[in-house]
Design a protein with these regions (language model features):
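Cleft-lining beta-strand/loop regions that shape enzyme active-site pockets
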Residues: 1-5, 14-16, 148-206
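Conserved catalytic cores of soluble enzyme domains
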Residues: 1-97, 195-206
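Generic detector of short, locally flexible boundary/turn motifs and exposed helical patches
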Residues: 1-3, 38-41, 113-117, 121-127, ...
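Short, well-ordered helical secondary-structure segments
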Residues: 24, 31-33, 137-139, 144-146, ...
Length: 206
């Protein structure tokens, strides 16, 4: 735990869960910046699933529940995980002293975009990015905001876009986590804000 905690903010931390990751292993996964899990046999849990009251179908430890709880960036087949992890590597620096990732591109940074201000958040970020490619994180969590890495003129940029809905606290947590990562690795951030404010309710107030 100590070594991984000390590495936080110095190098990007990745966790990949292919089978059972319980107790201490689940805590280690939660310390990572990016977490992935195989969606058939993968399980992520602090306590044995049968120790949780009402958890008859082992739902809490499965990929869908863990994605919705914000503990995973992506779940899929083994082949899909490999593709997704390689995509993450292509956008992100190796450490916090790495120069901003740049690559040669032919896409025009100054191209016109029709209907941009009426686009859904995810589509707007994709439209801005070189060749329309983005790498989205925590997609199933805090759905009032989209957090993704994109490229502008070959340089990796962090993108945050709100969806036009009132913000729930989960979306705020998601954006804050993303911003802290970008700050640690000197990644510039582009923000597209379209929201009427914050949801009303006890959870948001507390």
């Amino acid at each position: 735990y100590e070594k991984k905690a000390k590495a936080k903010g110095l190098i990007p931390l990745y966790s990949v869960v292919y089978g059972q990751a319980g107790g201490a292993m689940a805590v280690l996964a939660s310390l990572s910046d990016f977490s992935f899990m195989e969606n058939k046999d993968g399980r992520l849990f602090l306590n044995a699933p049968d120790a949780v009251k009402g958890n008859k179908n082992d739902d809490f430890a499965k990929a869908k529940a863990q994605e919705e709880a914000g503990n995973l960036d992506f779940s899929g087949t083994e082949e899909e995980l490999i593709t997704e992890i390689r995509k993450a590597f292509s956008f992100l620096p190796a450490n916090n002293e790495d120069e901003a990732y740049n690559e040669d591109v032919e896409d025009n940074l100054n191209r016109a975009v029709d209907g941009f201000f009426t686009m859904p958040a995810r589509e707007a970020l994709s439209t801005l990015s070189d060749e329309g490619e983005i790498y989205e994180v925590r997609r199933a969590y805090g759905e009032g905001a989209v957090t993704a890495f994109l490229r502008l003129n070959g340089q990796t940029v962090g993108g945050i876009a709100t969806t036009g809905e009132a913000l729930h606290w989960k979306a705020v947590v998601k954006m804050n986590r993303f911003l802290r990562f970008c700050n640690s690795f000197s990644i510039p951030v582009l923000t597209l804000c379209d929201t009427p404010g914050f949801e009303s309710g006890r959870c948001n107030e507390m």
